[in-house]
Design a protein with these regions (language model features):
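A short, Lys/Arg-rich alpha-helix, primarily the initiator
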Residues: 1-24
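Extended, non-core accessory segments
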Residues: 3, 8, 43-51
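Helix-turn-helix DNA-binding elements, focusing on the entry/boundary residues of the two helices
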Residues: 17, 33, 51
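Recognition helix of helix-turn-helix/homeodomain-like DNA-binding domains
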Residues: 26-45
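DNA major-groove recognition helix of helix-turn-helix/homeodomain DNA-binding modules
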Residues: 48-61
Length: 61
């Protein structure tokens, strides 16, 4: 997953970074705003575990 794909997923679904943070917290995972910002800007690559988490979040399982 590239940062452009991530941006598009947020736009298409109407979900926000805050929604992702709340969703992760419900699963017992702490996520920082800065991490998502770096992913969205392309300053930090999106590793496979992050990509899976984002895909799971956007898929609404």
């Amino acid at each position: 997953m590239k940062h452009a794909d991530l941006k598009q997923n947020f736009e298409v679904t109407g979900k926000s970074a805050r929604d992702f943070i709340r969703w992760a917290a419900e699963k017992g995972v702490k996520v920082h705003d800065a991490t998502i910002s770096r992913h969205l800007s392309g300053k930090q690559g999106i590793t496979e575990p992050w990509a899976l988490a984002y895909l799971y979040f956007f898929s609404d399982f």
